[in-house]
Amino acid sequence: MSNRWLLPENIADVLPSEARKIEELRRRMLDLFRTYGYELVMPPMLEYLESLLTGTGHDLDLRTLKLVDQLSGRTLGLRADITPQVARIDAHLLNRPGVTRLCYAGNVLHARPAGFNATREPIQIGAEIYGHAGLEADVEIQELMLAALQVAGLSDIRLDLCHAGILEALLAALPSIRQIEEAMFAALETKDVPALRELTQGLPDTERDALLALPTLYGGVEVIERARATLPASPAIGRALDELAALAAQVSNASVNIDLSDLRGYHYHSGVMFTAYVSGLPNYVARGGRYDKVGEAFGRARPATGFSLDLREVAALSPVEVRAQAIFAPWDADPALRFAITTLRANGEIVIQSLPGHTHELDEFNCDRQLQRQGANWVVVPR
């Protein structure tokens, strides 16, 4: 009996004060996206597994909860990431010829937590641009991501930039690397140079030296010039570094770091990647980048770039106060009071009628005004 109310590990209820804050930030961000011209879409919570994982990497498969559809007998997946679903909508349902801007907000479910104490039910919100291959789309998405963090009240943001094209160019001449690929990615992400040195034994000197240099290419924008001097002078690497320099130059409201070994999502991304951190905290608060290859898996190759964040994580960091301003009203059968309350609520005001015998029901609200009888009418006065 005592464990009936227990929830699965890393799953938690959202209580009123947190829910109010999350909803306030969700509305602010969606309103922000709308001012940029982004259209809201609402993909389903579950899909056939093969559709849900189309064009994604092995990591998303591991994070996806599976179940059997009792109607069709086919395997379903509960979404662990909304981004591929939005790419499917753009490629398969909308089928527009030009630029499309889409945004979304909804719960996702992870089979395994992404980190220590991480929730398995994030509330993901994000925005995507389809149809433009130029860096201008990446600049807009990067700007929108930083603006979303600002409307949440977060400040002192650091933006880390990377580019999937650099590693792709280094690995293009190394087909044998596929055998150690996962271990190599893990060593690069953790900047474990000794492990990377051991893994890359036997590789050609040029590529091995470049791979060993990636974890050291971390710091301010001056890292880009260090990378030009350190990495092979291939056209692909040169273009990638040029794009990073151009993207960094567009940032005015955050500090910029270059981290050429921050390769989380490498199999998914195809160009620039950016990650936002709040100063002093180890975990990122938002991630984005270019992923041109995903739409191709749905039968329509489209340039694409976007970002996403977890509203629950951002709400926990946000200083935004959302204790609602409300109007107190007594419990009274007077029709004039009912009319006054109905009119106020129709105008968007929160009006709380105190039920007889209860004194603590207003604690979650700031009732700075009250309805008071004046003659035959009820009027709002300071409380």
From Swiss-Prot:
Chief localization: cytoplasm
Location relative to the cell: Cytoplasm
UniProt-listed InterPro entries: aa-tRNA-synth_II/BPL/LPL (IPR045864), HisRS-like_core (IPR041715), HisRS/HisZ (IPR004516), HisZ (IPR004517)
Signal peptide: none
UniProt GO MF annotations: histidine-tRNA ligase activity
GO CC term, one of those recorded: cytoplasm
Single GO BP term: histidyl-tRNA aminoacylation
Pfam families, sorted: tRNA-synt_His (PF13393)
Pathway where this protein functions: Amino-acid biosynthesis; L-histidine biosynthesis; L-histidine from 5-phospho-alpha-D-ribose 1-diphosphate: step 1/9
Keywords: Amino-acid biosynthesis, Cytoplasm, Histidine biosynthesis
Further remarks about this protein from its record: This function is generally fulfilled by the C-terminal part of HisG, which is missing in some bacteria such as this one.
NCBIfam families: hisZ_biosyn_reg, PRK12292.1-1, PRK12421.1
Subunit and interaction comment: Heteromultimer composed of HisG and HisZ subunits.
Function comment: Required for the first step of histidine biosynthesis. May allow the feedback regulation of ATP phosphoribosyltransferase activity by histidine.
Family assignment from sequence similarity: Belongs to the class-II aminoacyl-tRNA synthetase family. HisZ subfamily.
Protein name according to UniProt: ATP phosphoribosyltransferase regulatory subunit
Organism of origin: Cupriavidus metallidurans (strain ATCC 43123 / DSM 2839 / NBRC 102507 / CH34) (Ralstonia metallidurans)
Lineage of the organism: Bacteria, Pseudomonadati, Pseudomonadota, Betaproteobacteria, Burkholderiales
